[in-house]
C-alpha cells in the first residue's frame, strides 16, 4: 500500500502528474553531481532511487515512515534503508558519504540549523549535498505540513553557517508549466476568497491540515478535469535547472564540503 496525501505526491494519480514530474526532475538534475557512497534523507516512496543507483557506489536512505523503508528494502535488497526521524543523524559516522540528497525535506525540519550542521558532519571532504525546497516567492497558499519555507537568500544564509562552497540554483518551468501554475493560482484564489474567517492565517497547523488536504485534492482534480491534456502531458522535460531566480518554483542548493 502506498502512502499518498497531497503532501506525499503520487506517481499514479493523474491529477498529481505536474507535481510528480517537478519533484522527479530534481533527481534528473542531480545526476551529474552524484558519485560514490550516497545518502538520501527523506526518500519517501523512493521516487528517484532508480536514477541515483545508476550513479552511486552504495546507497543508503533514511525516512521516518517505517512502512516506506520496509517496502523499499524488499524492492531494493542490496541497498540500506533506515526508519528514523532526524536530525540528529543517529549512528551515522563522521565523513561517511560522498553525496547527500534531500529533496523537499528541509521545510519539514524544525531544527534546520542542526540539519545543515549534521549534513556537513557526515559528508566526506569534497563531498556534495543537494537540497531542494519550495521557493516561498512562488508559494500560493500556506502549507500546514511545512514548518517554514525559504527565499533563496534565507536558504543561502542558513547553509553558509557550515558551508563555504555554495551554489544556489532553482527548478524552473516552461510555458506549459507556467500555464498550469497560472490556472492553479486562479483556482486557489477562488478558494481563498471563500475563507471569510481567514482560517489560512490563524488556524493551527494540526487543524488546518484537514481542510487543506480536502481542498488541495479537490483543486488538483478540478485542474485535471478542466485541462486533461495539459495536466497529463507534463514531464520532466518541461522543467529546467536555472540560475537563482525569484520565479523558480523550487530552490536547488548545491553544497560542497
List the predicted regions and their residue ranges.
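Short "lid" loop at the C-terminus of a central beta-strand within the Rossmann-like core
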Residues: 134-139, 149, 172-175
Amino acid at each position: 500500500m502506498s502512502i499518498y496525501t497531497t503532501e506525499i505526491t503520487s506517481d499514479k494519480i493523474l491529477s498529481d502528474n505536474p507535481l510528480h514530474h517537478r519533484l522527479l526532475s530534481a533527481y534528473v538534475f542531480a545526476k551529474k553531481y552524484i558519485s560514490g557512497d550516497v545518502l538520501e534523507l527523506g526518500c519517501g516512496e523512493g521516487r528517484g532511487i532508480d536514477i541515483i543507483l545508476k550513479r552511486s557506489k552504495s546507497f543508503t536512505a533514511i525516512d521516518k515512515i517505517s512502512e516506506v523503508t520496509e517496502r523499499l528494502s524488499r524492492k531494493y535488497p542490496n541497498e540500506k534503508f533506515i526508519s528514523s526521524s532526524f536530525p540528529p543523524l543517529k549512528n551515522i559516522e563522521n565523513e561517511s558519504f560522498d553525496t547527500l540528497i534531500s529533496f523537499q525535506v528541509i521545510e519539514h525540519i524544525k531544527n534546520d540549523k542542526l540539519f545543515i550542521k549534521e549534513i556537513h558532519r557526515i559528508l566526506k571532504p569534497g563531498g556534495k549535498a543537494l537540497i531542494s525546497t519550495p521557493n516561498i516567492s512562488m508559494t500560493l497558499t500556506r502549507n500546514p505540513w511545512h514548518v517554514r519555507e525559504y527565499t533563496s537568500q534565507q536558504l543561502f544564509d542558513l547553509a553558509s553557517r557550515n558551508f563555504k562552497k555554495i551554489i544556489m540554483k532553482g527548478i524552473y518551468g516552461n510555458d506549459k508549466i507556467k500555464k498550469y501554475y497560472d490556472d492553479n493560482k486562479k483556482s486557489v484564489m477562488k478558494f481563498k476568497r471563500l475563507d471569510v474567517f481567514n482560517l489560512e492565517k490563524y488556524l493551527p497547523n494540526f487543524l488546518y491540515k484537514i481542510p487543506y488536504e480536502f481542498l488541495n485534492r479537490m483543486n488538483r482534480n478540478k485542474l485535471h478535469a478542466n485541462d486533461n491534456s495539459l495536466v497529463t502531458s507534463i514531464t520532466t522535460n518541461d522543467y529546467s535547472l536555472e540560475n537563482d531566480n525569484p520565479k523558480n518554483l523550487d530552490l536547488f542548493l548545491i553544497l560542497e564540503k
